Structures are given as structure tokens and as C-alpha cells.
Amino acid sequence: MMKKYSLTTHSTETCQILFTSVSNVFKYIPSGTRRILIMYQDSVSQVLPIFSAASGVQCYRYLIPDSESAKQLGVAEQCWRFLAQNNFTRSDLIVSCGGGAASDLSGFVASSYLRGIKIIHIPTTLIGMVDAAIGGKTGINLKEGKNLVGSFYSPYIVLCDPSMLTTLNEEHLKSGLAEIIKCGFIQDESILSILEHNAQDHMDCSQRVCAETLPPKLLEELIHKAVSVKITMVDSDFRDTHKRQFLNYGHTLAHALEAATSHKLSHGQAVSIGMVYAAQVAFAKGLIGRNILTRHERILETYGLPVCPPEVQWRNITPYMQRDKKNMQNNDTDSYKDSREIPQISTQSKLVLLRDIANPFITSVSHTVLLEAYEAMFPQ
């Protein structure tokens, strides 16, 4: 049975997020569309035969690189040129098929070609369904950091088919679980409770739960809960100036680690480490008790996600953290100040922290505290 969500963007337009079979995609092609560019990753080429049934529409295929290697200016330029060479107009359509990197890149291409061409996202990974494809953020990477170039551009439709997740490997599932767990910490604690209860039933002798053993109905329930969290926050703050930034929980260190390690860490692995780090910072500042920090570590470790950073020196991380978008705005949402901190831009960074489960806020933290929290994550 189809389930539908509506997301209001910065304009009067509404993006529909549909949970239905991918074979229904042609029901949602805008009238007047003459050409469709299918931007796909090699890992999802099995979706392509669906588009061979198109009637009255000319379909083009464009293979893009897998994972973060897709999010480069050179790749975006090649896509723009392909669109131009094949005479795509504003009345035509892009369809992206793939993971989070596919929607980030294709959304950016769609937002900038002819200053805007319609796009439908078909996320084929868990992280795509619960995060990357929803909300209208697009982005490509620079050597100086992740997602430093991008736009806010809402897709026409996001079509999610959970049956496509049955072929995902363990690592891709774990990456998506990290984003689902994040939603549990920042808004919906029932997500954490569901995962903890499931762990009691499926834990192996190593005290771990294989993500591939998650019952399909349970996984779909978690997907809907995470999507609801994201829609709630994006609906009230499409341009990411306040409440939507709570979705960035764990991402300040995560993006820095991804860049500093040349994306050897997956996004989900980095977010997992980043959430534990944010909890460590909040604990160091006396905002949360050790029980909440321990809960972060326990649930993430149980599902096979890392809680300790790789061996990356702090001085190699701080330049990326200072470029975090939250540092560009005066958006503290709490009056909490550490009297020992000197409010200088060069000595502080803004993070999303917790006062409690489902009680996030944004505040400035001194680099002294940030370093101490980072060092505390390594085994003594």
C-alpha cells in the first residue's frame, strides 16, 4: 500500500515523498515531459529496464561514479554538457537512481542547469531514503571540505521503494542506520527503544546485531519514523537557518573526518563517530550525564558502527570543522556559556549538542573543550 508525505519548500511548491513500487514511476512524470535523463550508479543498473517501457518520452541514460567520487565539479560539468548537447529544456526531467551521492550530485545539476529543471529522486540505499534524497539539499565536494558547494532545490517527487533495500550489503545498511539512530537522539526516542528491543532478540555471541537481520517490517517502520523526523524539521526551516540544523547532529566532526581521510570512512561511519563525539562534548560541559553518552556508544556498537575515530591528528581536522556552515551564522539557540571560554571566532566552533534525548540545541564550544573531548574518545 502506498504511503505519502508532503514537504513544503521555501516557495509555494510541495514535494511529495511516496512509498510505492519503483515500477509506478511513470504515473508521476509531469505532463509535457519529452525527455528524461536517468542519472544512475552502476550498482542500480537493474532499475533501468523500467524506463524502457516509456511511451512518448525519450529516455537518456547517464552513468555517474559510485559514492563520493560522483560529487565533483568535473562530473557536474559533464552532466550539464550532456543535457545541453541533447537539447534538454525546463519542461524536461532528470531522474536520479542511486545512493546519497547520486541525489546530491543530480540535485545540484538539476538546480543549476537552465537555472532549474525538474527532478525525481529514486533513492536505492537506506541512507538515501531517510536522509539524502529528502529535504532539497544538493552538494558537491571541494578539496577544502565536503558539501561546500550546493543549493537548496526541492525535487518534484521522491519515490521510495523499500523492497530495493533487500539487496543492500551490511555496510550500506549500517550507514543508513546511523542516520536513523541520529533521528532517535534528536527527536524520536522510540527509534532507540525499537532498536534496543530488537537487539535483545537478535544479538549474536559477539554482542552485535547484523543489520541484515533486521525484519523488513521493522526496518520499514524505522524508515517512516526517520522520514517523519526529517520532514518535521525541514518543513519549518527549508533553508537551514535554525531548527533544520538539528539534523546536523554528529555531522560537524563527521564531515571533517570524511574530508581528512579522503572519504575512506563512509558517511554513516563518520556520523556514528560524530554523534559519540557530540555526546562526549556535551558530557564534558556538564549538559548530559554519562548514561546518555553510554547509550550512544552502546546502541551504535551493537549495530556494528564505530564509536572511536581513526588515527587522525586533531590539527588535520580543525580546518574542516572551522568551515562548517554553522560557523557562518550567529545562531546560538541557548544561553549556556562556559565562563572560561573567550568568545573569539578563531577559538570556537558551533555544534549541535543535546541537553537530553530529543532535546537538541546549537551552541559555541571552545577548541580547548573540543580537543579534550576528541582525545577522550581514544582508549586510554
UniProtKB/Swiss-Prot annotation:
Residues annotated to bind Zn(2+): E179, H251, H267
Cross-referenced HAMAP family: DHQ_synthase (MF_00110)
Lineage: Bacteria, Bacillati, Actinomycetota, Actinomycetes, Micrococcales
Chain sites annotated for binding NAD(+): G100, A101, A102, S103, D104, T124, T125, K137, K146
Protein keywords: Amino-acid biosynthesis, Aromatic amino acid biosynthesis, Cobalt, Cytoplasm, Lyase, Metal-binding, NAD, Nucleotide-binding, Zinc
Gene3D superfamilies: 3.40.50.1970, Dehydroquinate synthase-like - alpha domain
Keyword check for Nucleotide-binding: yes
Record protein name field: 3-dehydroquinate synthase
One of the Pfam families matching this protein, by short name: DHQ_synthase
Family that this chain belongs to: Belongs to the sugar phosphate cyclases superfamily. Dehydroquinate synthase family.
Database matches in InterPro entries: Dehydroquinate_synthase, DHQ_synth_AroB, DHQ_synth_fam, DHQS/DOIS_N, DHQS_C
Disulfide bonds: none
EC number: 4.2.3.4
Locations listed in the record: Cytoplasm
Annotated cofactor note: Binds 1 divalent metal cation per subunit. Can use either Co(2+) or Zn(2+).
Catalytic activity: 7-phospho-2-dehydro-3-deoxy-D-arabino-heptonate = 3-dehydroquinate + phosphate
Gene Ontology BP, a term: chorismate biosynthetic process
Biological role: Catalyzes the conversion of 3-deoxy-D-arabino-heptulosonate 7-phosphate (DAHP) to dehydroquinate (DHQ).
One Gene Ontology MF term: nucleotide binding
